[in-house]
C-alpha cells in the first residue's frame, strides 16, 4: 500500500476506472454475441440491428480509451463480414 497521499488517491481512481472498463468490455462481448446469435439463427433484420448497436458500442469504447481504435475496427469488420455473408 502506498504511503503518499496522491498515490492513495490514484489507487482508488485506477480501481474505479478498471471496474468501469470491465463493465464496458462485458457490454461489448454481449453485443457481439447478439450479432453472432442472430447470424446463426439466420435472422437478417435482427443481425443488422445488432450490428448497428455493436458498432456504436465499439466506437464509443475506442473513443473512451477502453479498447484501442484498431481493435475496435478489427472487431467491427469481423462482425460486419458475418452479417454481410448472411445477407448475401
From Swiss-Prot:
Give UniProt keywords alphabetically. Answer: Ribonucleoprotein, Ribosomal protein, RNA-binding, rRNA-binding
- What domain of life does the native source organism fall in? Bacteria
Instruction: Look up the record and give one Gene Ontology term from the biological process aspect.
Output: translation
CC per GO annotation = cytosol; small ribosomal subunit
Record has Electron transport as a keyword: no
Its annotated function is as follows: Binds directly to 16S ribosomal RNA.
Q: Which family does the record assign? A: Belongs to the bacterial ribosomal protein bS20 family.
Annotated NCBIfam families: S20
For this entry, the protein name equals Small ribosomal subunit protein bS20
Q: Which organism is it from?
A: Micrococcus luteus (strain ATCC 4698 / DSM 20030 / JCM 1464 / CCM 169 / CCUG 5858 / IAM 1056 / NBRC 3333 / NCIMB 9278 / NCTC 2665 / VKM Ac-2230)
Designated gene of the protein: rpsT
Amino acid at each position: 500500500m502506498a504511503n503518499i497521499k496522491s498515490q492513495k488517491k490514484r489507487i482508488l481512481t485506477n480501481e474505479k476506472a478498471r471496474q468501469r472498463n470491465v463493465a464496458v468490455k462485458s457490454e461489448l462481448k454481449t453485443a457481439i454475441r447478439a450479432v453472432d446469435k442472430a447470424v446463426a439463427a439466420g435472422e437478417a433484420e435482427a443481425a443488422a440491428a445488432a450490428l448497428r448497436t455493436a458498432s456504436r458500442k465499439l466506437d464509443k469504447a475506442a473513443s473512451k480509451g477502453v479498447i484501442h481504435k484498431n481493435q475496435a475496427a478489427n472487431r467491427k469488420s469481423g462482425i460486419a463480414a458475418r452479417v454481410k455473408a448472411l445477407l448475401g
